[in-house]
């Protein structure tokens, strides 16, 4: 079973997939004039000025809640466990490739979030967005099958990367703490922890997007800030080793053999591991965060797109980098070639702070994992609704809750292989859609900046789709969507209509 998964994983994350993931990120960066850098200062200003914790109103969640929900799904065990695994398997150089994927992924996530708002629909009292709606309404009904393929893999990914890997990491972290203080791992104890978490997850999923968003906006900032402070404390105490850690990262990217003492010798392995773990931790290219961002009430699609830029920066460039530096600066022995999961991260912190910090790490890991399960629970529910309607949502919520308990007794290696494999499979239709719809992304970006620089202007674009022309509640002259969203006989509801540019690249 494991060998079969390894073969499938290597095929999915082979050279073609890496070229596609990095290539689309580079393509979108060039087409938007490297919007992830031009709009970054504006994104920070907008976030500080306008996006504060609070209610999103009757039809959606607030932009801050959308960002926290997306971060809840990304800033999870990938930051603690995934980074350690990347260093063990791919060497320190894998962090360099994780950075590269992160920088290009900022453009990808910008596109995902902006287009999710552009092509979302309204169902009852909620906005529904994501790659499946981008594909259906942006590319046309003839591509609906590709949206169904994405939703199908999205449901399986919610059980894997958004559930099983998180619970597995929590169990490993808690058992590690118990072992340090004289306890031990027992199957019964694992199952009890799984059942307890399952009950919490089930209660949250029943509350829908609003309850998940409200939980995320309180949990994610607090836990992230605490973890960052722990990391900064370690680096201040080991400040003399920080330059050497950066040297290992850059040297390992081109010559893993030199950086790992001859144990790892493939530069492509460092690239492959860094990219696959990078996608796992920031999910740029997978399109999942677009589901959360598409639920936000914002004035313009590009405005929420900028929150996508911040999301990847906080997750990969900040938190993942801090984790990697802590491991490399702590002085712990790194078991190259053997993925030991979060135990390496725990050893790095305890070697500096002592065993007591393992309790804090286990608590942070539990909170991160719980938030990730909630975020992915929302993604899975949206995918199930797209495929099967309301009954599919209820069935998914039930299965997701049961899977939490079952995942407590699964093996780590099998879970991670399966999760990364499904990640690669669901990224393909999303990346195709992003490239196809890039002209509309460019138009939105230019409309937002008014071609006068990078300073954003106040534009009201609170719009939604229902497979009909764009409805706008603003004084701006906003174009209606392409013909693929307009049914025969429907009237344009915009005050003044200007046809959108063709979505063909």
What residues fall within each predicted segment?
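Helix-loop-helix module between adjacent transmembrane segments
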Residues: 28-29, 101-125, 136-168, 175-204, ...
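Membrane-interface loop-to-helix entry segments
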Residues: 20-27, 31-44, 167-174, 189-197, ...
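Transmembrane alpha-helical segments of multi-pass small-molecule transport proteins
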Residues: 18-23, 99, 147-152, 178-207, ...
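Transmembrane helix-loop junctions in multi-pass membrane proteins
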Residues: 31-36, 78-83, 160-170, 201-213, ...
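Transmembrane-helix boundary/entry motifs in multi-pass membrane transporters
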Residues: 47-67, 102, 113, 117-158, ...
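N-terminal alpha-helical transmembrane segments of multi-pass membrane transport
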Residues: 1-77, 87-94, 105, 405, ...
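Alpha-helical membrane segments and immediately flanking helix-loop junctions
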Residues: 55-89, 115-118, 124-132, 136-138, ...
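Extracellular/periplasmic helix-exit of transmembrane alpha-helices
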Residues: 110-119, 124, 232-248, 259-262, ...
């Amino acid at each position: 079973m494991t060998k079969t998964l390894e073969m499938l994983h290597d095929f999915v994350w082979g050279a073609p997939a890496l070229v596609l993931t990095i290539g689309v990120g580079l393509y979108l960066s060039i087409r938007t004039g490297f919007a992830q850098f031009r709009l970054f200062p504006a994104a920070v200003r907008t976030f500080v000025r306008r996006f504060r914790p609070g209610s999103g109103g009757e039809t959606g969640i607030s932009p801050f809640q959308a960002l926290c929900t997306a971060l809840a799904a990304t800033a999870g065990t990938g930051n603690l466990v995934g980074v350690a695994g990347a260093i063990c398997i791919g060497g320190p150089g894998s962090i360099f490739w994780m950075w590269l994927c992160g920088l290009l992924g900022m453009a990808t996530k910008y596109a995902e979030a902006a287009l999710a708002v552009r092509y979302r629909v309204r169902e009852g009292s909620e906005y529904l967005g994501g790659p499946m709606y981008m594909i259906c309404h942006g590319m046309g009904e003839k591509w609906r099958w590709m949206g169904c393929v994405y939703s199908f893999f999205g449901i399986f990914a919610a059980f894997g990367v958004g559930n099983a890997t998180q619970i597995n990491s929590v169990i490993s972290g808690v058992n590690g703490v118990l072992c340090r203080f004289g306890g031990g791992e027992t199957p019964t104890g694992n199952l009890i922890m799984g059942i307890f978490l399952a009950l919490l997850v089930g209660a949250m999923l029943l509350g829908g997007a609003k309850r998940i968003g409200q939980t995320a906006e309180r949990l994610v900032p607090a836990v992230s800030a605490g973890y960052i402070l722990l990391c900064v404390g370690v680096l201040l105490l080991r400040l003399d080793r920080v330059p050497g850690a950066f040297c290992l990262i850059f040297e390992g990217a081109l010559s893993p053999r030199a950086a790992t003492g001859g144990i790892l010798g493939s530069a492509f392995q460092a690239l492959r591991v860094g990219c696959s773990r990078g996608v796992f931790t920031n999910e740029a290219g997978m399109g999942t965060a677009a589901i959360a961002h598409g639920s936000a009430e914002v004035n313009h699609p590009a405005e929420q797109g900028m929150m996508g830029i911040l999301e990847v920066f906080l997750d990969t460039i900040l938190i993942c980098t801090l984790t990697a530096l802590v491991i490399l600066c702590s002085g712990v022995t790194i078991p190259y070639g053997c993925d030991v999961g979060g135990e390496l991260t725990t050893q790095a912190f305890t070697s500096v702070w002592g065993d007591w910090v393992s309790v804090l790490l286990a608590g942070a890991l539990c909170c991160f994992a719980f938030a990730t399960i909630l975020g992915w629970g929302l993604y899975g529910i949206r995918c199930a609704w797209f495929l099967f309607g309301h009954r599919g949502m209820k069935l998914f919520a039930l299965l997701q809750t049961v899977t939490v308990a079952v995942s407590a007794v699964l093996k780590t290696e099998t879970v991670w292989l399966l999760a990364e494999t499904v990640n690669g499979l669901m990224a393909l239709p999303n990346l195709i859609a992003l490239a196809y719809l890039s002209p509309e992304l460019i138009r939105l970006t230019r409309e937002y900046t008014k071609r006068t620089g990078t300073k954003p202007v106040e534009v009201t674009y609170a719009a939604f789709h229902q497979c009909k022309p764009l409805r706008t509640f603003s004084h701006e002259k906003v174009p209606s969507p392409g013909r693929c969203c307009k049914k025969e006989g429907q009237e344009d509801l915009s005050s003044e209509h200007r046809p959108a540019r063709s979505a063909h690249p």
